[in-house]
Amino acid sequence: MSDYDDLIPLEDAVDRTIACRNAFFDARPKTTASLDDLSGEILAEDVIAEVDQPSSDRATMDGYAFTAADEGPLEIVDERVFPESTPPTLESGQAIAIATGAPLPERADTVCKREDATIEDGHLMRPTLETGTYVYERGSNVTAGEQLYEAGERLSALDAILLRDLGRETVETYEPFSVGVLATGTEIHEGRHTDLDSPMLCSLLRSWGHEPTYEGSVPDEGRRVEDRIDELAKRHDVVVTTGGTSVGAKDYVLDALDALGEVRFHRVRVRPGKPIALARLPDHDALAVAIPGKPIGAYVIAALVARPLFTGDRPTATLERTITHDVGLGPEGFTYAIPVTFEGDDATPLGHVESPLAVYDETFDPSVLSSSTRAAAADGFVLTTAPLEAGARVDVIPTSGFE
């Protein structure tokens, strides 16, 4: 039996993570969020439009409103329609001055821009325009009864625009997770090694809309690891540990999770970062995510597998770039996350001997690279299951897409 036979594919791990999240969210308390503080909030209600938006046909340019089917010249009515106006009814053969954003009079269906208008003796020379030119039609943005958001969606600042247009000032959201972040490792606990993972993970968790607390460290002692996780699960919704997730003599986190709850998976076919674990801790109605200790591997696997637990979605936004060097891969059956830096349209594999960080020649070495803090300078990551050829176009997930 291969050492890798018990690993699960990336997509399977993400599916299990999201399923665990959905079950967990069913019992989450709810709160109210104002539109000026939406980023990262998780919506707890469906949002359905109550009225058409816009509520009437509106002009998108300053100019003259008229009916496209009328023959010219068109008599200009001695009025002007503003956004706050109640427009008059136009008779056949008439036009009216109108401001951007103003409602069109009844019968009017077209607007001629002011700078394109020809006026003679109080009449608008009939412009050659298609029906609907420079008109924002009623309901073209939102139709009454249309569902625009579904409970569980993660909101951003951009959503405030549409929600405000719908007349909302607040929305119902789920309370963010309280997250306890615990570093494991005797060398960290005794101050001999710097904890590189916890600040990064706390920053990620905040960018995902939740409330992390750094809870210190614990040495590589099985009972103490279990007791600390148990203690934190009483106070937090989610416990995130770093280090101790492999199967070495001093890796106790998985044993602790087994003793305290139900491990949903352990080890994913991703390099770097494969020894991640997700567990449910039913005695405390909490979840635990165990992240491997090497910093770049920790970042990659947290962004790919842990992120969906907190956001409900997957990082899918990519940029297309040209890879500058051949990159060979190790064992088959893995998704490799290859860090790259950008220069114009090119993506240089960070870690390749021709890059500023030279840790491998022809074959990608996730083990060494995962420990390299210089790899934190990456602009993005290429996810691939096949070797890369210099000159090929590749999809890159920018690091901003993980946040």
Feature locations, PLM:
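Flexible glycine/proline-rich
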Residues: 256-403
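Solvent-exposed alpha-helices and their adjacent loops that cap or buttress functional pockets
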Residues: 57-59, 68-69, 87-91, 104-105, ...
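Short acidic loop-to-helix transition motifs that present clustered carboxylates
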Residues: 82-83, 217-225, 270-275
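Phosphate-binding glycine-rich loops and their immediate beta-loop-alpha structural context
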Residues: 134-253
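Phosphate-interaction motifs
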Residues: 2-167
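Structural motif
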Residues: 64, 73-75, 94-97, 109, ...
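Flexible, glycine/charged-enriched surface loops at secondary-structure junctions
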Residues: 25-35, 212-215, 243, 315-320, ...
